[in-house]
């Protein structure tokens, strides 16, 4: 009953207004005393491990978002160096992992979503990934919220897709149809030695914004699907383990690979917690 009420509340809440307001407050430097109280409460409530942060003193962060997107101290995470290993791009918990069924990506029992819609509604963009592999990783409030490359790659396209801002958790995954292809998201497409790779950064309720290292905060005001091409001198090269983006509060990363490009590690299963840099799959490098 409580789950149903929670899901119903997601439909009636003014998601965009609430999330944008939360984002502005999280970026505010006007009330440092209040900011410090909120951060202290947040650390206690969610069990944030500040000992692994580059700046362990929570009062040193000028805003809540600066705290939320905090860097890790050197050596806090180890990136598996094996060239044939695809590594976890984030700290989080695996929501689902497996094979794409034509154009359908498994979401939860009785629920799936469209690969084509996830990537912005373009059939040509989605085609290389049909029957491919996917992993959906949820970042909880306590997690490190920067996103890193699971393998080396060259950015070729970024797509902003406007949408809803449902909360992203097991309850909504089981009860909100097409959740990850319904929420606001940023799809980043790369060329790699194993073929094309897509990393989709999915927004959620209270997520202030999604940010990439090459474009900053991605939030067009057009309300339309917006895409950017990166060719020639504009191409952006990334090394394995290099930061590529971050969430300013919350959410989920969907990693998509072509058929046969990767074999997931046997221990990487739904509900397992993962850390940035650990072995996630074995690549079939071309």
Swiss-Prot record:
Q: GO terms for biological process? A: phosphatidylethanolamine biosynthetic process
Query: After translation, how is this protein modified?
Result: Is synthesized initially as an inactive proenzyme. Formation of the active enzyme involves a self-maturation process in which the active site pyruvoyl group is generated from an internal serine residue via an autocatalytic post-translational modification. Two non-identical subunits are generated from the proenzyme in this reaction, and the pyruvate is formed at the N-terminus of the alpha chain, which is derived from the carboxyl end of the proenzyme.
Q: What is the name attached to this protein's record?
A: Phosphatidylserine decarboxylase proenzyme
Gene name on record? psd
Task: Name its cellular compartments.
Answer: Cell membrane
**Mitochondrion recorded as keyword:** no
The metabolic or biological pathway listed in the UniProt record of this protein is: Phospholipid metabolism; phosphatidylethanolamine biosynthesis; phosphatidylethanolamine from CDP-diacylglycerol: step 2/2
Q: GO CC terms for this protein? A: plasma membrane
State its Enzyme Commission number(s): 4.1.1.65
Is Lipid biosynthesis given among the entry's keywords? yes
List site positions: Cleavage (non-hydrolytic).
Answer: 250-251
Which InterPro entries does the UniProt record give?
PS_Dcarbxylase, PSD-B, PSD_type1_pro
Sites of the modification Pyruvic acid (Ser)?
Answer: 251
Q: What class of enzyme is it?
A: lyase
GO MF entries: phosphatidylserine decarboxylase activity
Which cysteines pair up through disulfides? They are none
Top-rank taxon of the source lineage equals Bacteria
Instruction: Name the predominant localization.
Output: membrane
Q: Which cofactor does it need?
A: pyruvate
Q: What is the annotated role of this protein in its UniProt record? A: Catalyzes the formation of phosphatidylethanolamine (PtdEtn) from phosphatidylserine (PtdSer).
**Which key words are in the record?**
Cell membrane, Decarboxylase, Lipid biosynthesis, Lipid metabolism, Lyase, Membrane, Phospholipid biosynthesis, Phospholipid metabolism, Pyruvate, Zymogen
Textual note on the cofactor: Binds 1 pyruvoyl group covalently per subunit.
| Catalytic residues of the enzyme | 91, 148, 251
Q: Which transformation does this protein catalyse, written as a reaction?
A: a 1,2-diacyl-sn-glycero-3-phospho-L-serine + H(+) = a 1,2-diacyl-sn-glycero-3-phosphoethanolamine + CO2
Organism annotation? Marinobacter nauticus (strain ATCC 700491 / DSM 11845 / VT8)
Organism classification: Bacteria, Pseudomonadati, Pseudomonadota, Gammaproteobacteria, Pseudomonadales
Q: How does it sit in the membrane?
A: Peripheral membrane protein
């Amino acid at each position: 009953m409580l789950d149903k009420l929670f899901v119903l509340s997601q439909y009636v809440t003014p998601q965009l207004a609430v999330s944008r307001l939360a984002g502005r407050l999280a970026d505010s430097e006007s009330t440092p005393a209040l900011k410090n109280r909120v951060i202290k409460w947040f650390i206690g409530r969610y069990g944030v491990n500040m000992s692994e942060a580059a700046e362990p003193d929570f009062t040193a962060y000028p805003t809540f978002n600066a705290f939320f997107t905090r860097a890790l101290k050197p050596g806090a995470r180890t990136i598996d160096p094996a060239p044939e290993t695809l590594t976890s791009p984030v700290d989080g918990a695996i929501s689902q992992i497996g094979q794409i069924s034509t154009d359908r990506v498994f979401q939860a029992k009785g629920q799936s979503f469209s690969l084509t819609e996830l990537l912005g509604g373009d059939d040509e963009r989605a085609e290389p990934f049909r029957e491919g592999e996917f992993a959906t990783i949820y970042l909880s409030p306590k997690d490190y919220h920067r996103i890193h490359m699971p393998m080396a790659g060259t950015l070729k396209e970024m797509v902003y897709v406007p949408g809803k801002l449902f909360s992203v958790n097991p309850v909504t995954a089981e009860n909100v149809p097409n959740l990850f292809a319904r929420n606001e998201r940023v799809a980043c497409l790369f060329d790699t030695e194993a073929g094309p790779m897509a990393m989709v950064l999915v927004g959620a309720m209270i997520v202030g914004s999604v940010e990439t290292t090459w474009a900053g905060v991605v939030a067009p005001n057009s309300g339309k699907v917006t895409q950017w091409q990166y060719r020639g001198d504009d191409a952006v090269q990334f090394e394995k383990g290099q930061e590529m983006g971050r969430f300013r509060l919350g959410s989920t990363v969907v990693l998509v690979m072509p058929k046969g490009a990767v074999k997931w590690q046997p221990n990487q299963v739904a509900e397992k917690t993962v850390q940035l840099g650990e072995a996630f799959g074995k690549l079939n490098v071309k």
